[in-house]
Amino acid sequence: MTWGALALGVGLIVAFAMPSYRQGEASIAGTTAKDFKLELAGKPTHLSDLRGKVVVLNFWASWCPPCVEEAPSLNRLQRYIEPRNALVLGVAADEDAYAFSKFLVDQGVSFPTYRDPGAKDRGSPIALSYGTSVIPETYVVDRHGKIVRKIIGPQQWDSPDMRAYFDSLLAQN
């Protein structure tokens, strides 16, 4: 087999796989965000208790380099959206409580963050309930508790495009 034939074969696989991947991603839009119990500001609560707010639900871990990369822009996004009844909510897949706490301090995390106490072997039961197997992964949840967007991988959360997206979303009832 020549290199050209191999490249063509790989290209065809990618070309046919990508549309189904995108369709799968789109299919989550409009579904109700899975509820889970967490502790915020020392008080037990549920994700569903945050209805009425736009929630940027970010799954991350301290051992994840892309999560470290995007943490500063998530902090800036939190400052940008918080005055408009929205928040970034982090859920960490850290089994190690010390590593989790150190990450929060080292990165100056300013958004509410919860360590999934069931996290083991680099996995979070809460993240897995969403179908998340790669982190960072983020779900944007509207004021009605519906998922409106799923974003895989690190982002520049305070970029002009992201700000425009959140401006539009926050302008909706």
Question: What are the residue ranges of the model-derived segments?
Answer:
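Thiol/disulfide oxidoreductase modules built on the thioredoxin-like
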Residues: K102-V109, D116-S168
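A short beta-strand-turn-helix
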Residues: D35-V55, Q78-I81
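Conserved hydrophobic/aromatic "anchor" residues
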Residues: F36, T45, F59-W60, F103, ...
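Structural microenvironment flanking redox-active thiols in thiol-disulfide oxidoreductases
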Residues: V68-G108, G118-L128, A164
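Short pre-active-site segment immediately N-terminal to redox-active cysteine/selenocysteine motifs
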Residues: K53-V55, W60-W63, V134
